[in-house]
């Protein structure tokens, strides 16, 4: 599964720039790169599903990049975890999209007084069905945090691992339930 195609929230040369870029991963699946975590963009005939939404100040640029690949609105945002570079844009999306995350990610957002925690949560797994496309999210256990979601696109055999996947080394957020032993098991 992981060997087919993986795109992670890793820091790359592109992310050192101030602006965001969009790149096609597979047909109907894109990644937006820039400072902080990557955003997954799954395009369907009935709307767009975002995996993470970066920082609040990135909202307009993300919307512009999405409009380059789809004329459909963002219907869902699935946060891979609570960190601001993955969920900070929730404040902009909360009134126009459904936001979904693992229960622990929501709890971490509330404990950290973050704006716009998700209204929809899951504990083990969930799925979004939109425009004939299925997107699944799984909680595999503690790792980067205690609320990491791994997102799977079955039709494309591709995963988005949030900050569970890094190009250099894993970052474990122990203060928010992260576990290096759990990360090994999760991976």
Language-model features and meaning:
Residues 20-65, 149-153, 157-163:
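Conserved beta-strand hairpin/beta-sheet module of binuclear metal-dependent hydrolase folds
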Residues 58-59, 82-88, 106-110, 145-147, ...:
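Active-site environment of divalent metal-dependent phosphoester hydrolases
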Residues 45-49, 57-100:
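Active-site metal-binding motif and surrounding structural segment of the metallo-beta-lactamase
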Residues 24, 47-50, 55-57, 103-143, 145-147, 154-156, ...:
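Metallo-beta-lactamase
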Residues 1-13:
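Bacterial N-terminal signal peptides
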Residues 16-17:
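Boundary of Sec targeting at the N-terminus
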Residues 28, 42, 52, 66, ...:
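Divalent metal-coordination and catalytic microenvironments
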């Amino acid at each position: 599964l992981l060997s087919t195609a993986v795109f992670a929230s890793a820091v790359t040369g592109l992310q050192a720039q101030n602006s965001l870029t969009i790149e096609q991963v597979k047909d109907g699946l894109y990644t937006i790169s820039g400072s902080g975590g990557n955003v997954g963009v799954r395009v369907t005939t009935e709307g767009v599903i975002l995996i993470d939404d970066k920082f609040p100040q990135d909202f307009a640029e993300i919307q512009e990049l999405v409009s380059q690949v789809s004329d459909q609105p963002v219907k869902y945002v699935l946060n891979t975890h609570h960190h601001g570079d993955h969920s900070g844009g929730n404040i902009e999306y909360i009134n126009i999209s459904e936001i979904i995350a693992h229960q622990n990610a929501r709890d971490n957002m509330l404990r950290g007084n973050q704006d716009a925690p998700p209204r929809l949560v899951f504990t083990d797994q969930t799925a979004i069905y939109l425009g004939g496309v299925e997107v699944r999210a799984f909680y595999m256990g503690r790792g980067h945090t205690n609320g990491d979601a791994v997102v799977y696109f079955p039709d494309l055999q591709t995963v988005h691992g949030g900050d569970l996947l890094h190009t250099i080394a894993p970052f474990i957020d122990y203060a928010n339930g992260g576990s290096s032993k759990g990360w090994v098991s999760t991976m």
